[in-house]
């Protein structure tokens, strides 16, 4: 990647240099050429390929989720921004590729390209959805994608309709509903017979900011989602509208779309800001077979709001809040889909449906009962590549969801409504029958009129053709066939019904038997439980044996009494039996009566009527027909009426059959309530004969014929009773079936005869058959009346049955229970043991049978598996052959078609025979194609069958496996023994194999030694031949054969050389053998040493094992003691706890009681005291008031008495002195006047005073007047005194009462004091009780503390126990490991012994070989050839040298082994280093990411610079436009000046008149030019100011970039230093500190995550980055210090742990000594198993060695992997450093570019200065022109010359100005190109960084 990036950068820099050169060379080109180049640089849009969508009608059969990707075209904004650059490429109609890094391919169900129309999309997506919803499935279709990807266009599109047709841009929703209502109309018309009706309900809602709003009723907001068991998830108070056409749906859609939240963003002009859900519920209802079927489907059409980013959409304020809510709900949707995918993969996950309103509402659509289609909309433009990728990943995850769609159908009809309907139909039937039978009914009249017309027509017929007769005959035959078929169907239905009834009866009997068995079992179980309970009590000695026997006798006596009572209560059984006998006799009598000839008479009459009917028909058809047309119409009408009546009869039959079935079901239900239904059936049988007798009496007027029919029906009714009675008497089912068969067969036999009679009455209208017809009508009416009477009687019978069943149900149940109790009590004791034994034996037999069956099944399954495998192979081969044959046939057919076409085209003229042959061939080929297609279908069917068979076999395998597992569980011990035997055999086999291998190797070695000896044997023969030749050389033949000898000698020399070479080879082999021997010796020595060491280790291990066993025993004893103590302490603790709880409960109860009593006493006393005190206080106050009042009253009375006494004294004095005279005079006058009336006065005075004081009254007449007055005064005084005395007495009485009350008050106060004293005593007692409570609570607390201490001790003991157990386990594991090592060592020793013996044998062989070689060497020494000896010496020297080298090599091998160990240690350290290096790499990755963020911030700053540059460019363009306008203005002025000169030259005489206005115009123009120049100057000054500002900003940017570069370099240096320090620490660190290093690594990894991102502006970001870098340095220093401290702490902890381990090891050693002691005792018992253990140990050692070898190999592999990972990490680090260097280079390049831009800006400033200078020059020239204009007034020629010069100067100035402007434009375009190149390089760099 780095290489590619460097190459790309070099290429880009070279291209930039080339562009610069071209720009410098083409500086003088004009603006048009630059514009043309820009247009040529733009990309030309490539043609998008078109892929058609594949429609798969069988897709939804086995799948429930469909995912479709829709790609929208690139819009204008995207094309202007990025051209036609794409991030997606469609490969096919189901695949597309993402062109980013890395290139990824996605596969979906459908991929819709940019050119797919809305109609085609609806055909693939919407149409199947409608079909599924009409079939009763729930459906959901929702569009997903980013904002502006075309979701709303896909779902809604254009909702307007043109000419009642949808436009081509209409979305899926209107098209779906258009097709839906068309299908509804079609289905309703097609299924009109089923009364199919569809109902559609629609609702429209939106989810805006996680609040649900009804779009059809916008006032209802914030609706709530509810969940119901029946409804599922629904929205509360949501408006649902019924729709019946597309127009209604369009109105709702328009209304909802108008109310939906829409807003404009940067990505879309009309962006939907909410999720909308349009729901349609489609309900269909139809009737079939008197059942109402209901089916409904829910269709959800969801338009999701798009996911968006704030940067791209520019959302602010409310739009930003909306975007946040939308993204939240969409992220929840993605999370739900991810969890659903995990659930589909078999993981247990919680699906967070309720985290969002959208997912909660679409719960069924996502992983529920629905067929769901997801349309993912994507944009192919490169600017939205990340959103497109996320959408594709979302769709790929959604494809893995698994829904479970079901048909929502309810086929349960309303039973009550059906029953009512049956009753209504019954009533209608009876009414119709009555109306038809009545003579005044219209049907009767119609019959008569019809018969009269037919009679007239028969008499007045004309001669017609015989064809009409044949037609009528055919119609009649057809009707007769229809009647026969209907009767046949009825008979078949009746037979099926009877069969089902028999089956139901048998099943009921079985059910009753099962229930009786269960009841018997329950009673037996209860009795057994009671007996067991008694026996347990007897066994526990809770009841004595005598008591047990007494209890059992009493219980048995009670049971016997109860049974006797039940038998006595059931005295009615005998009565029922007698009634049964009587009813059976009646039935027999009725049967005899019916058999005596009534049925035969009826049959004879029917046969006579049938013959008569046939005779009439023959006469009718024999006569010549007249007026056949009218007769044909009448017959047709009659046939239609017959057909209608037939249909009605059939319907009635069906209804009656259903009623019969229902009645039978009810009877069965009643029968299930109790098996012995004797009483009700007897009552029924007793009631029915009376009813039948009534029926017979009522029907007596009908004659013998009707009486016979009545008798027959009575027989039928009585047949029912006989059935019931026979069922009670337990008759066989065949007889019941025959009895049931008789009654309906007779009825059905009479029904067709009656129909024949009716038909005969309708057809026959002759005079001769009039009487028969009338008779038939009367009979039919009577029969129908009888039917009605029978129905009434049947109703009465059913009522009587119900009453009887209700009355006798209780008696039946009681009788049944009594029978059960009797039966159970009689057979209980007898069958108890036998039943249990039989059950056990049966279970054993079943187990054995099941085992045998399972084995047989397993064998059969294995055989079947083999057969299936062979069949599947044959089938696959056959399929391959068939497919190849079919493909070959297709190819041959194609070739034949081509050949035929070629032949036809080759013929010059049309030949009919050829065309016929061609057509035949075509037909044959078509037929073959059909055959091929049929074969393919059959192939597919066969494949399906094969799959089904495989599945069934798989199920059978599972069952057999389950059975075998059950058997295996039963036979575990035997299997383990077999396994051990197998292991032993395997071990024996392995030992034999090893012995065989050793023997083979020894044989090979022997063969090699024999070959070596043969070669050595050949050597002396050769030497002997050479010696013989030398001896013969001294002979006489030497001279003769000199030449020949020389040749031979040369040959021999060659042979000798060859042999010497062979000898050298042998010596080399010998040296190798010596080396191997030496190595074997060294190995032997090392093995002997190792063996001795192993023996020592074995002894030590044995000792350790003995110690461990001893420790184990001690630990076990300690554990047992601890457990015992623990149990004792636990018991003690429980007792204490119980005591404490009891004490606490008692104390709490006492406290509560005392508190309650104290509170009650306190309340009572306080209430009484308060009441008494208040009474006392009120009474005292009243006393005080009364005393005070009495005192004041007495004082007043005394004062009044004194005043009255004084007044009386004064009055006496006055009366005595002054008034005495007047009184006397009055008295005298009175006496005079009254002188004559003394007699009247005295009695009057006496009468007046008599009631008061008689004495005074008597004194009055005898005293004088003065005395009378005195007496009056005295009397008044006496009276006053008496009244005062009375008051005084009364007051004294009151005072005494008050004193008594005071005494009572004193007593009450004393009582109150006593009560207070008592309350104080009670309070003291309470205080004492509280103190006692506190003491007891303190005691309780102490007890609880002790309890806690005990619990802590228990916990510590438990922990100690756990520790001891863990140590025990550890010691056991150590002992087992040591045991295994001992076994391994034994095996190694044995192997070494074998190797030693083998090496000894080899050494002996080699010693023999050496002796032979020495002998040969001696022989060679004795020979003449010294060269060989010298060579041998040299060889010996070489051997010595080689042996020395070998020793050196061995030393080097030892060194290498040491190095290898060091390398292993280093590798382990390198592992730790690699771990830390990974952590460091992760930290560097994080650091690189932070740097990338900084680079992004710099890129943002560069973007801001780019924006400023664009602003400057715009201003420069504006200047250019102003300059151009100024040039145009100058040109126009020059043209006007030329025109003026021409005018002046032509009219010299009028020059003086025209000078004044021309001058004025020139002055005005000059002023305008001056103003324009001033404006231009101002603008230039503004531009210079802005340029200076931009220079300052660029300078600041440079400074900041330089600081950033310095900081980054410093950071990289610090990072390198830290990395080196880390490596140094890793090299120094020990192996035990890896975990701490990993922890610190984690802390380091977590450290940079706390870094905060910078702010928006680049300057703040740079300053924050500097601060962050400083803070990071401080943090890293602190982290390093912490790490040092942690390492020191870890060292201390490790030392402590080492101390602990040493102490534990010492304890373990002591324990092992004890264990070894115990093992010594155990060894005596293990002598018998020594051989077996040795073999097992051998095998274990072999296995352990193999495991060690495998572990070493695995460790080597892991080391290699770690090394590779380490190398990979190093490469990643290098790549990171390279990236850093590249970024530095990029920064430097950016700095250079910025400097170049600054230079260009300086150039532009210089050009601006030059332009200003030129402008000043122009102004000066304008001034000069003004002066020249003034001079023009003098002379015309001077004016012409000056104007001409001015024009030329202006043109030259304008040309120079335009040239400079062109140069500035070129520079600007060059800068723009450079800027775009930099942008592209940065974008590519960021992509590479993100991919890396």
From Swiss-Prot:
ATP binds at residues 145-152. This is Kinesin-like protein KIN-12E. One of its GO terms (biological process) is microtubule-based movement. Keywords: ATP-binding, Coiled coil, Microtubule, Motor protein, Nucleotide-binding. Transmembrane segments: none annotated. It comes from Oryza sativa subsp. japonica. Residues 64-401 form the Kinesin motor domain. Residues 1633-1649 have a biased composition (Basic and acidic residues). GO terms for cellular component: cell division site; microtubule. One of its GO terms (molecular function) is microtubule motor activity. Residues 1-28, 1633-1656, 1870-1892 are annotated as: Disordered. PANTHER family: KINESIN-LIKE PROTEIN KIN-12D, KINESIN-LIKE PROTEIN KIN-12E. PROSITE patterns: KINESIN_MOTOR_1, KINESIN_MOTOR_2. InterPro entries: KIF15/KIN-12, Kinesin_motor_CS, Kinesin_motor_dom, Kinesin_motor_dom_sf, P-loop_NTPase. Pfam families: Kinesin (PF00225). Residues 406-438, 486-526, 1066-1139, 1303-1357, 1396-1528, 1780-1841 form a coiled coil. Belongs to the TRAFAC class myosin-kinesin ATPase superfamily. Kinesin family. KIN-12 subfamily.
